[in-house]
């Protein structure tokens, strides 16, 4: 589960960059 956290953060950062 902990390995998913950095992936989720990078995904959120990518989405926020489009906003």
UniProtKB/Swiss-Prot annotation:
GO cellular component: extracellular region
Alphabetic keyword roster: Amidation, Amphibian defense peptide, Antimicrobial, Secreted
Keyword Translocase among UniProt keywords: no
Functional description taken from the UniProt entry: Has antimicrobial activity.
Family listed: Belongs to the frog skin active peptide (FSAP) family. Phylloseptin subfamily.
Keyword Disulfide bond appears in the UniProt entry: no
Modified residues (Leucine amide): 19
Expression sites by tissue: Expressed by the skin glands.
The protein, known as: Phylloseptin-J7
Bilayer-crossing regions: none
Any one Gene Ontology BP term: defense response
Localization: Secreted
Annotated source species: Phasmahyla jandaia (Jandaia leaf frog)
């Amino acid at each position: 589960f902990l390995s998913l956290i950095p992936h989720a953060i990078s995904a959120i950062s990518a989405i926020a960059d489009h906003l």
